[in-house]
């Protein structure tokens, strides 16, 4: 299998990776978030058109395997397990989340967020995630925090999300890894 960066259909996101790495580093710094000890299990894209999502899907099918395809919040989301990971900071992401466009318009097509796993009680996720962020960082202009509980059609585990964004790049926190969530769907 080919490396994802060598696939024609993925050249735009291969070129976008340095921008995302810089933006993620900058957001982490602004938030006072030390990412070094944290486990992030996947990286996600955003696009504006179904044609882009279909093209990226064709590309990922050439360099990985479809792990899951599910309807979440009214739109398809595919998870791909790549044979060669996406390198961001000290993380090696073998799982890529590819959502189709939804109602929300994102300012950029390309890499948009990472998801950090904070194992523990889902009820305490928000407090545990916020404790990692500086009060000063959270009060900066343009920084926003959102909580949600996205749920796949067959998902069995409660999977709350705390997302922190500057409007361009987002860091999300979950109590479960994406592979644990997929396993819960498959046992449904």
From Swiss-Prot:
Pfam families: YecM (PF06185). Coiled coil: none annotated. Signal peptide: none annotated. It comes from the Bacteria. One of its GO terms (cellular component) is cytosol. InterPro entries: DUF991_YecM-like (IPR010393), Glyas_Bleomycin-R_OHBP_Dase (IPR029068). PANTHER family: DIHYDROXYBIPHENYL DIOXYGENASE DOMAIN-CONTAINING PROTEIN (PTHR37519:SF1), PTHR37519. To H.influenzae HI_1582/HI_1581. This is Protein YecM. It comes from Escherichia coli (strain K12). The lineage of its organism: Bacteria, Pseudomonadati, Pseudomonadota, Gammaproteobacteria, Enterobacterales. The gene is yecM.
